[in-house]
Curated annotation (Swiss-Prot):
This is Ribonuclease 3. Homodimer. Its cofactor is Mg(2+). One of its GO terms (molecular function) is double-stranded RNA binding. Belongs to the ribonuclease III family. CDD domains: DSRM_RNAse_III_family, RIBOc. NCBIfam families: RNaseIII. Residues 5-134 form the RNase III domain. It catalyses: Endonucleolytic cleavage to 5'-phosphomonoester. It comes from the Bacteria.
Length: 232
């Protein structure tokens, strides 16, 4: 746990008073089950707490950020932000995947890369941070790690440009469409990706984003806005 404490201190200015609580947040049930005699606590209860505070803080942010959005739109956007896949991405950004304690079987089966385990650990960490500090510290962490991607539009793509581009290009038959990363810049928890979209090996658009998914959408948007003539 010392390496985790160093990451938290250096990247997020977080120092846990209760080190045992932090360890519990990163202990999966599979690890606790394999060490029953040691009576090790797992992170499910902390996950429950973290989920609640995350929902509250994201709801508060969206309510204040978008005063004209109806409740339905706010709920959909919140669901996109706090879904399993998104939380797993945030966990990876924070390097949390390196520190989760897994049982041997879970480790061998690829549990360290499983979105559900990573997302649960992220929520458990938020729960532990709430108990060790306060809701203000959790809010500070969320605003540092999550909100920049929200404001970059990663969870609010008005148009699915990748699908739209594919439909335009394949109207007369199948064509080979491929997206590739040109470059990655920035620290692990705040990367920026440059991506290009290629049709039959020819680059037809480029885009940038705080995730590969967002960068791909931007590249597709760039290609669509250029018009089909540039794609042939």
């Amino acid at each position: 746990m010392k390496e985790l404490q160093t990451v938290l201190k250096n990247h997020f200015a977080i120092e846990f008073t209760d080190k045992k609580l932090l360890e519990t947040a990163f202990t999966h049930t599979s690890y606790a089950n394999e060490h029953r005699l040691l009576k090790i606590s797992h992170n499910e209860r902390l996950e429950f707490l973290g989920d609640a505070v995350l929902q509250l803080l994201i709801s508060e942010y969206l309510y204040k950020k978008y005063p004209k959005k109806p409740e339905g739109d706010l709920s959909k956007l919140r669901a996109m932000i706090v879904r399993e896949e998104s939380l797993a991405g945030f966990a990876r950004d924070c390097q949390f995947d390196q520190f989760i304690k897994l049982g041997k079987g879970e480790e061998k089966s690829g549990g360290r890369n499983r979105d559900t385990i990573l997302g649960d650990a992220f929520e458990a960490f938020l729960g532990a941070l709430l108990l060790d500090k306060d809701v203000a510290k959790v809010k500070e962490f969320i605003y540092q790690v999550m909100i920049p991607k929200v404001e970059a539009g990663e969870f609010e793509m008005i148009t699915d440009y990748k699908t739209h581009l594919q439909e335009l290009l394949q109207v007369n038959g199948d064509v080979a469409i491929r997206y590739q990363v040109i470059s990655e810049t920035g620290p692990a928890h705040d990367k920026v990706f440059d991506v290009e979209v290629l049709v039959e090996g020819k680059s037809i658009g480029q885009g940038q984003g705080r995730s590969k998914k967002l960068a791909e959408q931007e590249a597709a948007k760039n290609a669509v806005e250029k018009g089909l003539d540039s794609c042939i």
